């Protein structure tokens, strides 16, 4: 059993929360120094609890906990600020980011750099009109943090720099090789350069980045669909039906 007690307050975000017993919560938390952890917040749902409104996703928190085993006990919690203003498609996008972190990261593995990427992604989602670039940058940061090393700038077959106008086919764990075919696994050189720089000038480059991250993340997510994606897909139908 792990003894991962926080000696002082730790910067955290709640990824997901669910009720436990009559008055408590189980929290899936992403912490700056300890990675993803699970906390029991005893009495957090009771009417007298001052934590009831604070332990929400997208609210920057300072948390202190103790205990052994896979589930720790929350001892103290203080909000750093109000929750980030996320609405509409940007809210669903932030929910997707939370679900990715909860599904992909192993428990209790420190990821301080990714925590900052996560914070930057949420901040960007709270301010932007189009969430797609922020999502692609975070997905690429997540893959990089897990050691998913892909060279976007060189042909895996020859070692030569990619040509912006040429087509390259992705081969898992190998990289990109020159190809004359065009399908779901092929990308233009300028798209690979854009993905490497995480800077998307055209819609085509942004679509290519989305296609690549879906391919790369699929083994980590398994066959279980993402709930946030399903909710987002259902939303336009609900609106058209007047719900």
UniProtKB/Swiss-Prot annotation:
Keywords: DNA damage, DNA recombination, DNA repair. Gene3D superfamilies: Nucleic acid-binding proteins, Recombination protein O, C-terminal domain. InterPro entries: ARFGAP/RecO, DNA_rep/recomb_RecO_N, NA-bd_OB-fold, RecO, RecO_C. GO terms for biological process: DNA recombination; double-strand break repair. One of its GO terms (cellular component) is bacterial nucleoid. Belongs to the RecO family. NCBIfam families: reco. Involved in DNA repair and RecF pathway recombination. This is DNA repair protein RecO. The lineage of its organism: Bacteria, Pseudomonadati, Pseudomonadota, Gammaproteobacteria, Vibrionales. The gene is recO.
């Amino acid at each position: 059993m792990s003894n991962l007690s926080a000696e002082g307050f730790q910067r955290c975000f709640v990824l997901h929360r669910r009720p436990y017993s009559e008055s408590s919560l189980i929290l899936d938390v992403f912490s700056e120094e300890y990675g993803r952890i699970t906390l029991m917040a005893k009495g957090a749902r009771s009417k007298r609890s001052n934590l009831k409104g604070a332990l929400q996703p997208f609210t920057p928190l300072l948390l202190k906990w103790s205990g052994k085993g896979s589930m720790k006990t929350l001892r103290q919690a203080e909000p750093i600020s109000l929750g980030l203003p996320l609405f509409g498609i940007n809210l669903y996008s932030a929910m997707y980011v939370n679900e990715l972190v909860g599904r992909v990261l192993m428990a209790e593995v420190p990821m301080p750099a990714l925590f900052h990427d996560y914070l930057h992604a949420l901040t960007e989602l709270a301010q932007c009109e189009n969430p797609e670039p922020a999502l692609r940058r975070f997905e690429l940061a997540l893959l990089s943090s897990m050691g998913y090393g892909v060279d976007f700038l060189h042909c895996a077959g020859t070692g030569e720099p990619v040509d912006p106008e040429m087509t390259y086919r992705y081969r898992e764990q190998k990289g990109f090789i020159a190809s004359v075919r065009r399908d779901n696994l092929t990308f233009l050189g300028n798209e690979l350069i854009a993905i490497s720089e995480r800077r998307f000038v055209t819609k085509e480059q942004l679509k290519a980045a989305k296609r690549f991250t879906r391919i790369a993340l699929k083994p980590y997510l398994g066959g279980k669909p993402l709930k946030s994606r399903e909710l987002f897909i259902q939303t336009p139908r609900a609106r058209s039906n007047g719900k």
